[in-house]
Amino acid sequence: MSQDSAAVPPLDSSRSTVPPIVQLRKVDKDYQLGKVLVPALHEIDLDIQPGEFTVIAGPSGSGKTTLLNLIGCVDVASRGQVTVDGRDTGKLSEKALTQLRLDKLGFIFQSFNLVGVLDAFQNIEFPLLLQKTLGKKERHARVQALLEKVGIAQYAHHRPGELSGGQRQRVAIARALVTQPRIVLADEPTANLDSTTGTAILDLMQELNRQGTTFLFSTHDPRVVSRAGRVVRLIDGRVVDDQATAAEVATAMAIH
């Protein structure tokens, strides 16, 4: 197996003296649907150490996306504590949450969440404009480099409506990476990609992971699971397995 495709060794968080970059304690999430209260997550305890390449696995409806949304500060827990980069997100103002997302987090949404009136280049550049830390030359150089790395430089000036699902997925991936975040949250990042493109994107993510970026995925894709250093399995909103070997889970997912 090549270095790029090899699984990242799992981190033993019980032995680490480095504070977790993400920590959840007794986290519940409920949704109100009319008069019915629907539980989505139940008493989640989870530590993610800096530099992990971790997969959240589980069937549809198990709570994977909900968990990422809580960590990504785009939703709030019903009960419990979510800490990201040392900050208790439940105690932050909306302005502080926005700044935390902008400075520390990159989020690859399953639904892309691209701005329809902006072209691919502008969508990727947008977080840098919000950050206001780079000049125009530096911004454009960074965006162009990512367009080339994800293989869509020729579509830089196409709007989302002019792109295929796979091309929009790659724009979303580049946008999540452009601020060089400490943590990347990826919700089914390979779902719209063919095998060759998916492999190239995962290679890029593992390269960034080796440079220190923390990655947390939700996925059904055995290709992603097989590369993980750690796999956390959810069923019905509960953690049922943690630190399972990637090979075992990938094999089970391929069979079922």
Language-model-detected regions and their locations in the chain:
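H-loop (His-switch) and adjacent beta-strand-loop-beta switch element
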Residues: V231-A244
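ABC family nucleotide-binding domain
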Residues: P19-A228, L234
